[in-house]
Amino acid sequence: MKLLVTGGAGYVGSVCSTVLLEQGHEVTIVDNLTTGNRDAVPLGATFVEGDIKDVADNVLSSDSFDAVLHFAARSLVGESVEKPDEYWQHNMVTTLALLDAMKRNNVRNIVFSSTAATYGEPETVPITEDAPTHPTNPYGATKLSIDYAITSYAHAYGFAATSLRYFNVAGAYGLVGENREIETHLIPLVLQVALGHRDKIFMFGDDWPTEDGTPIRDYIHIRDLADAHILALQSNVEGSHRIFNLGSGEGYSVKQVIDTCREVTGHLIPAEVAPRRAGDPAVLIASSAKAQSELGWKPQRTDLHTIVSDAWAFTSQLGDKAHSASRG
């Protein structure tokens, strides 16, 4: 297939592009490099630097594309609260421009990178796709609004579409892992402490209603995530918009993550308890039963030790060689 990948110089987009190329697909990547990195674009992909809302028509009209995988987005929750205008522009407005360009160029197959942030604070866990959607920040709100837009395009214009709502993506694949200029994810933050780039890791509360008092999250390996995108792409149905949760179905606490990082790296990794953050749920675990049933997807790398080991293999060589890969 000939595929357009937006945001393909970022963490998730570059790994998915790598796997698509390995499977023989032709990949064109569009990225404005705001958070992505040119070095993360895999060999064999055609690269176009630019904002998708400005170049989508030209790119889509230049070749006979079969589908679009849409990863390009701003994704920092805290920043979205401080700069909601930028998030609505970069996420919602840009996606509408992409959808319109797809319609004009008769490319009507799309897989969208959505998020578990669309659910907000869950009423029950594990979280299924029919759980109420009450995002608690502009980032989640923009993604949910895009889901609604895609549904309307599927019904009105025959788009074949899937939205994949990720939980906590982690790990690395090959030469690509998490290396953002502004890091907010727990595993890379802890590994930065192991490398000596940070003094300590903060645990936001140790009095949560969990076994060890720290919040529990569901971590999905980046390679398993890539597999889900390919399965969704291959099974999209004209005039339909499907939504799937993607997680391992297993939960690990903050303390478990820190202890596993200590075990994998051999470093002490100082940790300090800080006050709880407003809006943090105690437990977030996905139900991926629908994806397993309808897509035939089954995560293969659910063990926390495997996820951390792959992340450390990337992070440690990054620290040693001081070269950058994916920042997005």
Curated annotation (Swiss-Prot):
Pathway(s): Carbohydrate metabolism; galactose metabolism
Domain of life of the source: Bacteria
Protein residues bound to NAD(+): 11-12, 31-36, 51-52, 71-75, 115, 139, 143, 167
EC number(s) on file: 5.1.3.2
GO biological process: galactose catabolic process via UDP-galactose, Leloir pathway
UniProt binding sites for substrate: 115, 139, 168, 185-186, 202-204, 217, 277-280
Catalytic center residues: 139
Enzyme class per UniProt: isomerase
Alphabetized InterPro entries for the sequence: Epimerase_deHydtase, NAD(P)-bd_dom_sf, UDP_G4E
Family matches, as CDD domains: UDP_G4E_1_SDR_e
The reaction(s) this protein catalyses: UDP-alpha-D-glucose = UDP-alpha-D-galactose
Known cofactor(s): NAD(+)
Keyword terms, alphabetized: Carbohydrate metabolism, Galactose metabolism, Isomerase, NAD
Subunit structure of this chain's protein: Homodimer.
Protein's job: Involved in the metabolism of galactose. Catalyzes the conversion of UDP-galactose (UDP-Gal) to UDP-glucose (UDP-Glc) through a mechanism involving the transient reduction of NAD.
Stated family: Belongs to the NAD(P)-dependent epimerase/dehydratase family.
Name under which the protein is recorded: UDP-glucose 4-epimerase
Source organism (scientific name): Corynebacterium diphtheriae (strain ATCC 700971 / NCTC 13129 / Biotype gravis)
Gene (UniProt): galE
